[in-house]
C-alpha cells in the first residue's frame, strides 16, 4: 500500500557523470523545447503514481503513470549507411516507430528514461510484442524515432561502385543503393548516408534527397510491392 513517486533526471554521484540508461539507437530525432505542467524539483521531473500499489517481496510489477490515447504514430523503415559503407549482401532495414511528445499532435508530456515496449494487435485482435528500445530522458516537443527491430523482407545493399582521386586530398565517389521489398504492399525506406562532412558535395543523384546536417544526407525511397 505504498505511494510511489518516479523522479526523472541524471544526478551526479561523486564519481563522475553517470547515466542510468544509455540513449536508444537514435531514439530522439530532434530535441523538444516545450514546457509542461509536471512538477519539477531543481532539474528533475516528478511522476507521482495516481494510486497506491502493493509489491510483494521479490515481485516485479507494471504500473501506469501516463495514459494517452489516439496519439499519431507512423511506422517506417530506415537504413543508415556509414561513410564508404559497402556490403556484399543485402542488409535488413530497421523497423522504426515515429511519434512526437509535443503538446499539439503528440503525447504532450516529458518522458523519463527507460525501455519502451511496443505491441501490435494481430488479425484476431490479440496484442503481440513487436520490439523494444531504450530512450533517454526526453523533453516535451521532441520528435522520436524508436527502432523496434529489423525487417528481413525489406533489404538495402549499399555499394561503392567507383572511387577516383581528383587531387592531393580530393576524391570522387560513386555510390549505388539497391532496395528490395518482399512485402505485398509498397513501402518507403528512409535512407541516410553519413560521413559527408562540410566539404562534400552531392553532384548527381537519381532521387532528390535533402541535406539534413553537415555530414548527413537523407532520401525517402519508395519501393513497390514485391519489387525493387
Language model: regions and residue ranges:
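Long, intrinsically disordered, low-complexity accessory segments associated with secretion
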Residues: 1-228
